[in-house]
A protein has these predicted regions:
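A helix-centric hydrophobic-segment signal that preferentially recognizes long
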Residues: 1-204
Length: 204
């Protein structure tokens, strides 16, 4: 009977100190982070085929193609694991690398506007549609992660939860920069229905 009372008292104490809330919110952060990684990996997997397809019609756009390839390589050099959210510096490198890939892909899609044959290529149209869908899913996953980290970090900073967080090893989690989140949420778009007046290629 004594041990039952003791265990009940400990559980009540942990609940009162916010342990259950911290644990639940931390699990939500981890689940949302896993989805972020899945969607970024999905995008990275599209890049090689996109580059090869564009190269077939616009090989002279070497700077743009090289930029995308290098950005993809930089993303691949970072170990994207669940543990990344326990290392703020590694998280910042991951965010910067993904941002560079986003920028490079946008440039490549803008350049593709100058190549009507590329725009009419069925494989390219399919890949572009997949990329746009993936960018949308990335935006949704990022926003969910941002909100869950904001809630979690608020909880672990609050008294007396901060004491519980320190005692049980629940640090604050790094978050994405939200200043450009609205822009990130807009996937790169290419209008396949119109042909620019200068169609036919870009000369270096």
């Amino acid at each position: 009977m004594f041990w039952i009372v003791m265990i009940a008292s400990i559980l009540a104490s942990l609940t009162g100190c916010g342990y259950n809330a911290i644990q639940a919110e931390d699990e939500q952060v981890k689940a949302n982070w896993s989805e972020v990684l899945n969607q970024y990996q999905r995008r990275a997997d599209l890049v090689p085929n996109l580059v090869d397809t564009v190269k077939g019609y616009a090989n002279q756009e070497r700077d743009v193609l090289t930029s995308v390839t290098r950005a993809r390589a930089q993303v691949g050099s970072i170990r994207a694991t669940p543990e990344l959210i326990a290392d703020p510096q590694a998280f910042a490198r991951f965010e910067a690398a993904q941002g560079q890939l986003t920028s490079s892909l946008s440039r490549m899609l803008v350049v593709s506007e100058n190549y009507p044959q590329l725009k009419s290529d069925a494989n390219f149209r399919d890949l572009q549609a997949q990329l746009e869908g993936t960018e949308n899913r990335i935006a949704v996953a990022r926003n969910r992660y941002i909100r869950s980290v904001q809630a979690y970090n608020t909880t672990v900073r609050s008294f007396p939860n901060n004491l519980t967080a320190r005692a049980f090893g629940y640090p604050e989690r790094p978050n994405f920069s939200v200043g450009n989140e609205a822009e990130i949420s807009k996937p790169p778009r290419v209008d396949f229905g119109s042909t620019p007046a200068s169609a036919g290629g870009v000369s270096n």
